[in-house]
From Swiss-Prot:
Pfam family, one: CCDC154
Protein's recorded name: Coiled-coil domain-containing protein 154
Residue ranges of coiled coil: 69-160, 210-297, 329-403, 454-518
InterPro entries the UniProt entry points to: CCDC154 (IPR029512)
Keyword vocabulary terms for this entry: Coiled coil, Endosome
Length: 664
């Protein structure tokens, strides 16, 4: 499966995606809190710069994904080259085996020719003895001596040829063993290189996990700083409000005679400004939410297209793997049938040779007996020479027997070699069938585990959007409650200010009456009213301070609750990634990013800048898939080094087809 490609340089784990979504949540929270800060203009620029962060992250993610795709394509090309090399090596071995068989056949034909020559040499002197008459006996003996010398030379020549043939066979066997050792060495070197690449990948993944942890720590520090800044701002605002109230009370005492119309105008202008600012902030937040939704929809479309492309690749690779398996089975059956036919032919030829040699020996013995009887009757005068001739004939018979024994030994050796080769072939076939059965069982079991695991992960991922929505709803509710409380407190304070104004107006009236009448009783009443007014002012100050402390406590408690909820959500996200995230390069173990993941295959990812889960393939799944491919290919290469090329085209349907269900 050439997947949303990546290589060791990229290692974009799903933790990056999760951090992006957390940053978006934090930006939304901070914007919701900062929207209350209407008096500070610098915060608008800060929010604008904060909104640019996800866009930069998305651009980086796409670049890294493109790099990953390029690296995966390069790896696919390298694996195809490896397949071609393995095919060339197997073809070379088959050619060499054919050459060896041709040599063996040539040697067998030469042995037959030599046997015919020996038989002719054995028959020719006996015929000449029958044809020759008595007076030509001396010439006959000379020719017999010459023939015996020629037979001996022919026997020595035959023995030399047999020794050369044995040496050639040994040399060819040594060459075959050397080439097999070279091939095994090459395969082991390639396995070591792959293991080194896996270790490098694992190190890079651990580095990325550390970077993610550092990023999360930074985010937590930023959240704490934001909480502290918000608490300080609220405290400053409350202090400003308190000072403003005190100044207003002093101004009320000093400006008793100023008109109330100016105050009403000022209050109305302030309210209008506040409402206009609130509307602007509301419009800005709505525009940002729309932009974020549009981005989320676009990214969901891209991810769906990628998933469809990957599904098509999986189907194509499964078909390709099945075709390869069918072709391999056909080739193996054809080879097995050819070998069985050759073995049967060789057995029949060996039986015919044995029968032919036995018949020839019997004929030679009968001819020798007849020749001895005729020579005894016809050549009584030449007993000494006949005795010498009989000794030479006996030696020749012994040499012929030795030659027949040697031929039998050679036939036995050939039979043994054929039997050993047949046993080796049967053992290898049985081992290969066992490997195929085990691999199929492992694949079936793995698919079952993957389906169960995918269901669990899908349930967990589906629960995440609900948690995020609940937190956002809590934030909105909290914001509305705070707004209601602030408005209620403002109304209560306005009511208290109006009561103070009424009391001050009553005091002014009483002062005017004093100026007009100056009675002692009214002075005492005014003094009592002033005392009550002072008490009310003290009570009002105490109530303001108590309200301030209560609000501070409530705000601190709410901020703590928010931080705890965010921390729990973050922990749940990290736990999910750690339990279900990407895996290590060694498929024997079931972890890849040791800090993040455990037994992870294909899950639903969360799209960037989105709150809804999307069915998409991530970089970590591609890495996992590549791991499975390499693991299975290494198993095939170890147990069957001559047929690795056929299994290299293995990717999920189960990698890609995993990498088939072995290759991209």
């Amino acid at each position: 499966m050439s997947e949303p490609a990546d290589g060791p340089s990229l290692r974009l784990s799903p933790s990056h995606l999760s951090t992006v979504t957390l940053e978006d949540l934090e930006l939304l929270l901070t914007e919701g809190l900062v929207s209350a800060e209407t008096s500070e203009r610098d915060e608008c620029s800060g929010r604008a710069s904060g909104s640019l962060v996800p866009e930069q992250d998305t651009s980086k993610l796409w670049k890294q994904l493109e790099q990953w795709v390029a690296e995966l394509q390069a790896e696919v090309v390298r694996l195809r080259g490896h397949k071609e090399r393995c095919e060339h090596a197997t073809l070379g071995l088959l050619r060499e085996l054919l050459q060896v068989r041709a040599r063996v056949q040539m040697q067998a034909s030469e042995l037959r020719q030599l046997r015919q020559v020996v038989q002719q040499a054995a028959w020719s002197p006996e015929k000449e003895e029958l044809e020759l008459s008595g007076p030509q006996s001396q010439n006959q003996m000379q020719t017999l001596d010459k023939r015996l010398v020629e037979v001996r030379e022919a026997l020595t020549h035959i023995r030399r040829k047999q020794a050369l043939q044995d040496s050639e066979r040994k040399h060819s066997e040594q060459e075959i063993n050397l080439r097999l050792t070279n091939l095994t060495g090459m395969l082991s070197q390639e396995e070591q290189g792959r293991e080194a690449a896996c270790s490098a990948l694992q190190k890079n993944q651990e580095d990325t996990s550390q970077k993610v942890d550092l990023g999360l720590a930074k985010m937590q520090a930023q959240m704490t700083k934001l909480n502290e800044e918000m608490s300080l701002r609220f405290l400053k605002r409350e202090a400003k409000l308190c000072s403003f109230l005190q100044k207003s009370f002093l101004a009320l005492e000093q400006r008793m005679k100023s008109s109330e119309s100016t105050r009403q105008i000022a209050e109305s202008s302030l309210r209008e400004e506040l409402e206009s600012r609130w509307q602007k902030l509301h419009e800005l937040t709505e525009e940002r939410l729309r932009a974020l939704r549009a981005q989320r929809e676009e990214e969901e479309g891209h991810l769906l297209e990628q998933c469809r492309g990957l599904d098509k690749a999986v189907v194509y690779l499964t078909k390709f793997v099945r075709q390869n398996q069918v072709s391999l089975n056909r080739v193996l059956m054809a080879e097995q049938k050819a070998r069985e036919a050759k073995v049967s032919l060789e057995e029949t030829q060996a039986g015919e040779l044995a029968s032919y040699v036995h018949e020839n020996l019997e004929a030679v013995q009968m001819a020798g007996k007849l020749a001895q009887q005729e020579t005894q009757d016809a050549l009584e005068l030449l007993q000494e020479k006949s005795q010498v001739l009989e000794g030479s004939v006996a030696g020749l018979d012994q040499q012929l027997k030795d030659l027949s024994d040697h031929c039998l030994a050679l036939s036995w050796r050939l039979d043994l070699q054929e039997q050993t080769l047949g046993l080796k072939l049967s053992q290898k076939q049985a081992a290969w069938e066992g490997m195929e059965r085990e691999s199929l069982k492992d694949l079936v079991q793995w698919l079952k585990e993957v389906t169960a695991h995918l269901e669990e992960v899908q349930e967990k991922v589906n629960s995440l959007p609900q948690q995020i929505e609940s937190i956002s709803n809590k934030c909105v509710i909290h914001k509305s409650e705070v707004d209601v409380k602030i408005s209620a407190e403002g109304k209560a304070r306005e009511f208290e200010v109006e009561t103070v104004r009424q009391e001050l107006a009553a005091l002014l009236m009483s002062v005017q009456l004093l100026k007009e009448e100056n009675p002692g009783r009214k002075i005492a009443e005014i003094q009592g009213q002033l005392a009550t007014f002072q008490k009310q002012m003290i009570k009002l100050e105490n109530s303001l301070q108590a309200n301030k402390t209560i609000q501070n406590l409530k705000f601190n408690n709410e901020t703590k609750l928010r931080t705890e909820e965010i921390a729990t959500l973050r922990e749940s996200m990290l736990r999910l990634w750690s339990e279900e995230g990407p895996w290590p390069l060694t498929l024997g173990s079931k972890r890849v990013f040791m800090s993040l993941v455990r037994q992870r295959f294909f899950i639903k990812d969360v799209a960037l800048d989105a709150m809804v889960s999307v069915n998409s393939w991530g970089v970590y799944q591609a890495v996992r898939w590549l791991r499975w491919k390499r693991f299975l290919l290494n198993l095939v290469a170890q147990k069957r080094p001559g047929v690795t090329s056929a299994m290299t085209q293995w990717k999920p349907a189960y990698e890609v087809t995993s990498l088939t269900v072995f290759q991209k």
